[in-house]
Amino acid sequence: MSDNNQATSNASVLTGRVVSDKMDKSITVLIERLVRHPLYGKQLRRSTKIKAHDENNVCQQGDLVRIKETRPISKTKSWTLVDVVEKVEKI
């Protein structure tokens, strides 16, 4: 028998752009995906806004972030920040 000490996670991980960071310890992430139209075959851009938990308030509006699904944190939050992929420059 092999001893596997690492816990495997089935939680889904998504990448998106932060559109709002005005809440304390929370961010709103815009997730975009491409969907093919069933009849015409054209690729359509669909988007979803997801609220995620940002414990240390490290994200700014415009950052590219990776989030993962977790237990429900509040009524609308069940995602948490994994890491910031790309920081936006402040002018």
Curated annotation (Swiss-Prot):
Keyword Hydrolase: no
SUPFAM superfamilies according to UniProt: Nucleic acid-binding proteins (SSF50249)
GO molecular function: rRNA binding; structural constituent of ribosome
Keywords: Ribonucleoprotein, Ribosomal protein, RNA-binding, rRNA-binding
Function: One of the primary rRNA binding proteins, it binds specifically to the 5'-end of 16S ribosomal RNA.
Family: Belongs to the universal ribosomal protein uS17 family.
Protein name: Small ribosomal subunit protein uS17
Source organism per UniProt: Psychrobacter arcticus (strain DSM 17307 / VKM B-2377 / 273-4)
